[in-house]
Amino acid sequence: MLPFKLWVDADALPRILREVILRASDRYQLEVTFVANQNVGITPSVRIKSIQVMSGADRADQEIVDRMQANDIVITQDIPLAAQVIEKGGIAIHPRGEVYTTANVKARLHLRDFMDTLRGAGVQTGGPPPISERDKREFSSALDQTILKQKRKTA
């Protein structure tokens, strides 16, 4: 197994991305842990695990931050979690394939706060569109590239 792990913020993970993650685990012999406040329906194995946390705001996020190590990879669309992962020396990837950086996380946090302000004022902001096949390909590519980069870095 590799010297780093893959953590998945599974509460809001689109189902079509699970197969991408499981294939990557097989291909790279990578340990994956799905963390959610509900049963994610993943069959555990030597490399695949799931942790069910108590219901509550950000419990799964906190579990990931508490358990992850530097160089681990985290799949999340939660911007504050991505910021914590980066701060702790990990790599965070959005389910649409964007690899978070210190710069783009700050920009996304500002945008998120602005959108929260708009929603608080009663403005309907809508949500993101469903994950497309193109998004799935971009996520798969970003995940593969990140795993390979981490393999070289930790070898």
From Swiss-Prot:
PANTHER family for this protein: UPF0178 PROTEIN YAII
Family of this protein: Belongs to the UPF0178 family.
Matches recorded under InterPro entries: UPF0178
Protein's organism: Acinetobacter baylyi (strain ATCC 33305 / BD413 / ADP1)
Name assigned to this protein: UPF0178 protein ACIAD2644
Ranges where the record places region Disordered: 120-155
A Pfam family it matches: DUF188
